[in-house]
Structures are given as structure tokens and as C-alpha cells.
Amino acid sequence: MIELTKNQLNSYSRQILDDYDSKNPSTIFKDKITISNEDAWRIQSTVTDLRKKRGEEVIGYKIGCVSKDTQLKMGFTKPAWGRLWKHELHSDGVTLEKSNYSNPAMEAEFGIVLNRYLTPELVNLDYILASIETIHSIIEIHNLVFNGNPPFGAELLANNAIHAGVVIGKSTKGNIQSQTTDLKLIFDKEIIDTWSDKKWPYDMVSERVVS
């Protein structure tokens, strides 16, 4: 696959940002363009630079497509990640307008706040656990829009892993050695999905460290 030229990279990145601002994501993929995952990463990074230049702030990262089945479906060989933006971080109890999103979808997740920057050469499960300041139940919001052809991995990456925001719950101190918990996603008082008997930290963290 031919690498994008600098002009193509800049053009696609500006269109991705314009689409984000107009709440109409991923219009460039309606033309069924084909780009590599590597170029999609470059687009995400270029859009990040544009957003930073206008005053937006990256506060963290999301990790997705952890399971091998999902990676295969998306055309990945490893998990995907995207940036978390300060103005898209919402507190528990917030009221959000559906009109600010495009085909919004939600996932119940666990999020962590780190107490230090991570040194890649030192990363293992024990190091990660010692680096956790607080643990939070969260709701991640996606703009669930794919206009291109499958697999959709490059489209997902170019659109910041289709991340559109996160609602963060109350904190729990991170020095938990072992605990079993449940996680539920409830919409209009109806349980949409549930995960029972999840063991912290192994069911939440170890797969991400190993991948």
C-alpha cells in the first residue's frame, strides 16, 4: 500500500478535524479511500497537533481492541489506542446532549489515574499496579460511525479510536491487591450488559500488559 503524501496527510487530517467539529465524523471514508494502519496513526497524530495548537489538552489515553478476535476483525495485530481530551472528560451525574454526538454508543469500562509517568523498559504487571493512583468505573462514549470498507481498523485509528468522551465515576485507591467485582451498564433503568466476578487486577490489567 502506497504511503500518503504530506499533502494527502494534511488534507485528510484537516477534514477529520472539520468532521469532528461539525459532529459528522468520517466523511472522507465515504469515498472508500484505502489507507494503511500506519498512515491512520499519522492522521490521528496530525489531528492531535492541530487540536493542541488551538488550545485543547490531552489528559490521557484509551486502549481498545484488546481481544484477539476484535483485532482480527479490525485488521490489527495489537490493541488500538486513542487520546483522551480534557474537555471530553465529564463527572458522574452529568447531563449530555445526544445532538453533540453521531450515533453515540457507550461502553462500561474501568479507568485508572497514574501516579507517575511510565518508563517503557520497566513495564510489567507489578510496575503497572504500583503506578496506579486511583481506579474508576467509567462510561466511554463512541461516535459509532464507519463509512469505509471493512476491515475498519484504519478508519477507527484515524478517528481517534472513535472516542467521543468519558464519564468518570468516583475514585477507589489503587493499592488493591486482589478484589472481585461486578460491572454493569444500565440505560433507562434497564441492564444492557453486565460483567460478573471480574478479578482486579488480573482481568482488567494483565491482558493489556501482555498484549
Descriptions of predicted regions:
Residues 211:
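Glycine-rich phosphate/ribose-binding loops and adjacent secondary-structure elements
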Residues 2-206:
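Catalytic-core "active-site belt" of small-molecule-metabolizing enzymes
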